[in-house]
Structures are given as C-alpha cells and as structure tokens.
C-alpha cells in the first residue's frame, strides 16, 4: 500500500502553514512593527515549531494505540517492544517499592505469575484493550531531542530511527535536528538571537522534512508488523 500521512502529520503541517504565513506577513518592510517586535515574532514561531513537533509525537503515539484498541487488534499484531516496555515499566515500579520497604509478601503478591493484568502483554491471543498505556510510552520522551527520539521510537520497535530517516532522505537528520534545537535553546535562554524570515522558513522546511521521514519510517514499520489498517 502507498504511504499515507498520519493524522498527527496533517495537524503538524496545518499548524506550520499558519506559523510561516504569520512570519511572512510581518516580514514586509511596510509593516509598522519595529525590528525588535518582528524579531520576537520570528523567535516565537521557532518555539512554536518545537512545540508542534512535540505535539506530533504525542498525537502519533496516542493515535497508534487508539487504532489498535478501536480495531480490536490482537496482542500478536502489536510490535514486541511496546509490549516489553509496558511490562518492564509496571515491574519497575513494583521493584522500586520493594527497594524502599523490603516487603517480600507484597512483592510476591504483585509479581505473582497469575497476575493477568501484569502479564497480559505476553499472551499473544488476547484482544488489545488497555494493555499498554500510550501516555506512559510518550510523555517522558516527547521533547524532540535526538536522544529522546531514539528512545521513543525504539519503544515502538524502530531500533535506529535516524538510520531509517537518513536512509529514506539521504541526509543527516540528527544533525539537522540538533541545528534547529540549538536555535530554539538560544531563544529559550533569552540570548541574543537575530532572525530573519529566511531563517524561519529554512527551519520550518528542515523540520517538516524530518517529520516526513519520521512518519514514513513509522508507516513502514507499523505496516510490516501490524498491517496497514492500523495506520
């Protein structure tokens, strides 16, 4: 099946068009704004671009598991990594509790091999309901740093996300992302950052390109394991 854009990507692109349009409108010389005011608006679009990328990651992950649930996927149709991460996350909180209180009775009860809620992700025949919490997968890794993207996409089974994006797009997307985040961090720390509309346009073009490759890599991964209907 040919690639189709995720809902998360469509929302990102709609927001990007609005932001670039705003930056373009205030960039003209006849607009009655000072250089400082224009620069603040340009900076704001960069910060909002980063927020839009965060939102893409959140919506993409949450939509994926919503699709699994609404279409009654079996556990076997879900990639192994999110199932394993879910089990690890639940067990980790149990072990952390044991480290604090050394209550062996409680940990044996909670880790009991008959605990269906804990080990349900192991049973490939079950129908997916709420076995995996999508927020648990994405919430602590949605800030789009290269490190977070590597971890987040590994959680859904893509072990080397930048290898995939670089293969598809024939360029170094991790470097592209770092370059954008350098600008965003400079703005966040209120350091002097003079931007032009061309700077804004270039950053939006680069991040939209990155997101295109993230979306395509994810599409191929989900379709190969789960099937196109869950996209």
Predicted regions, residues:
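Polyanionic, low-complexity intrinsically disordered segments
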Residues: 1-25, 144-231
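Secondary-structure capping and boundary motifs in well-ordered enzyme cores
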Residues: 41, 45, 49, 172, ...
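Short, well-ordered alpha-helical segments
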Residues: 47, 51, 205-208
């Amino acid at each position: 099946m040919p690639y189709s854009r995720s809902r998360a990507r469509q929302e990102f692109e709609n927001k990007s068009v609005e932001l670039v349009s705003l930056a373009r409108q205030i960039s003209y010389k006849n607009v009655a704004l000072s250089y400082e005011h224009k620069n603040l608006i340009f900076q704001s679009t960069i910060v909002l671009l980063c927020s839009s990328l965060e939102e893409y990651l959140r919506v993409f992950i949450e939509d994926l598991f919503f699709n699994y649930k609404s279409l009654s996927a079996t556990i076997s149709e879900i990639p192994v990594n999110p199932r394993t991460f879910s089990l690890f996350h639940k067990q980790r909180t149990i072990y952390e509790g044991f480290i604090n209180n050394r209550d062996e009775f409680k940990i044996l009860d909670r880790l009991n091999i008959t605990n269906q809620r804990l080990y349900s992700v192991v049973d490939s025949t079950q129908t997916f309901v709420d076995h995996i919490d999508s927020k648990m997968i994405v919430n602590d890794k949605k800030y789009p740093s290269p490190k977070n993207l590597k971890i987040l996409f590994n959680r859904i089974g893509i072990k080397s996300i930048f290898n995939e994006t670089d293969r598809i797009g024939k360029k170094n997307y991790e470097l592209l992302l770092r370059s954008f985040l350098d600008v965003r961090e400079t703005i966040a720390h209120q350091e002097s950052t003079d931007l032009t509309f061309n700077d804004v346009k270039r950053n939006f073009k680069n991040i939209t390109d990155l997101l295109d490759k993230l979306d395509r890599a994810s599409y191929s991964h989900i379709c190969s394991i789960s099937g196109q209907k869950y996209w």
